[in-house]
Every structure is written in structure tokens, then in C-alpha cells.
Amino acid sequence: MADVMLRFLGWRSLLIHGDPSVLDRWLWLRRNLRKGAVRTFDAGCGNGAFSLYAERVGNDVLAASFSEREQEDMRRRAQSLGVNGIELRTIDLRMLEQHRGELGRFDQIICFETIEHVNADETLVKSLVAMLEPEGRLLLSAPYAAHRPLYSEEQHPSPVEDGSHVRYGYSPERLRQIAERADLEVVSQGFISGVVSQKLTNLMRRLTRRLGLPAAWAIVLPLRPLALLDAPLSRILRYPYLSVALCGVKRPAAAADGD
């Protein structure tokens, strides 16, 4: 289904193929990603939408995922779009330290909705920061600790690293603490995906279980423009957001230590 949409709508179709929060993350990314000829690492690239966007705005991109299937899907989609500026790697981010030398340095790193999948989250963030050039930036997002459980989501996940969440979420203070302990200066922080996006995500998950993904996607599609009301309604209702995100810049002292 994703490949059919790709032929008609291009890379942007990947932003609306999954749940509505994917588009929300891209909107945040668009405001914080450096454009132009910079080297970008997408750590935990998923369906590749953010990697494709980074390539489209001039970045030299390396996209990594532990899933060979995701990487093969990404390779096929990039070829279909005529995209040549993305290098693909199958990497278990828990073992990132073993790959640092071969991967090199980056001007910016995207790590969205990934650290909640690993027990050693602080270690992973420190490894990512060590891969940044001086004054490079890390764009980091993770589930918000106070969000309401989505349909089928475990509020008390198992600590076993099996690909699912090992942690329910992070407070903004905790995410900032992790970043600062890794020698990042946090320059911006915010929330992603409010009440509308979460309700649409729940609806899509329920419909997918009952009717399958194509039917669920078609039913939810006309409702997606309601996301324009997401921020104001979330404020009025005081509804907790789904994710917390930050942009951190590598401190000069940390840059010197990483050499």
C-alpha cells in the first residue's frame, strides 16, 4: 500500500501512511532540521520518511535501522523516487559504539521515538552526541511520561528488549537531563501530538485490528485535517501530549573530548 501511494504522491505519502503522529513529528523536524549540504544521521529511521525529507532539503543522509525489512523497503522506495543521497545501514543501536568509527561524524542526528526501546538510553544518547561535529545538533523525541495510553499500549511495559517499549515515557525534565549529561546544550524543547492526533491514532489502531490497514487508512484519511485543531484543543482541554522533543547542540568542550 505504501509503495502504491509513493508512486502517486511521492515521499510525502509516507507522512500519512502510518498514524497521524508521524506527520506531527515531521512538522517539528521541519522547524529544527538544518537545510543544505550537511551530513545527517537518522538513527532509527523507520519507514524512511524523515530521511527522504532530509535528502530533499540537501542533506547527505545515513539512515540506520535494526530491521532488515525496513531497510529493504527504504532502499526500494528511494530507488523508486530516484533518490541517491541516502546511505542505508542495518545497525542495532544498542551496539552503536562498535560502529562509531566506520560511520564517522555528523552535523546533525535525528533520533525520534527510539530511546524508549532500549534500557541503556543514556548510553545511546552519549554515543550519538560523540558522533556529532562541534556545534552539531541532536533532534530527539520520545513518549511523554504523562500521556494517556494509546489503544493496545502497555502503561507498564516489560524491561525485556524485544523491539517494543521498555519504558512508558519521559518527563521534559528527564529528557533534558539525559541530553545535558551527554554534554548537549538544549536550545529548544516542546511537545508533539495532542488530543486530535491521539484520538485519530486510537481510531486507526482499532479499525486496523478489525478491518485491516487499507480500510482503516481510508476511513481515517478524511478526518486528518482535524489535526489543524490539535494544538488549540489540547490547550483548552489541558490534554497531555503524546511525545516530548528537544533540540540540543554539542558543547565545544564535549566536541574536543570526542576527538
What are the language-model segments listed below?
Residues 10, 154-162, 203-209:
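Short glycine/proline- and charge-enriched loop/turn segments
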Residues 118-119, 132-134:
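Helix-to-beta-strand junctions that scaffold the AdoMet/dcAdoMet cofactor pocket
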Residues 141-166, 177:
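Short, glycine-/aromatic-enriched active-site segment of Class I SAM-dependent methyltransferases
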Residues 119-123, 150:
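Short N-terminal helix/helix-N-cap motif within the alpha/beta-hydrolase-1
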Residues 113-117:
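A short His-aromatic
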Residues 1-104, 108, 112, 122-125, ...:
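Conserved N-terminal segment of class I S-adenosyl-L-methionine
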Residues 184-195:
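Conserved S-adenosyl-L-methionine
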Residues 197-227:
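C-terminal helical/coil "lid" or tail adjacent to the Rossmann-like core of SAM-dependent
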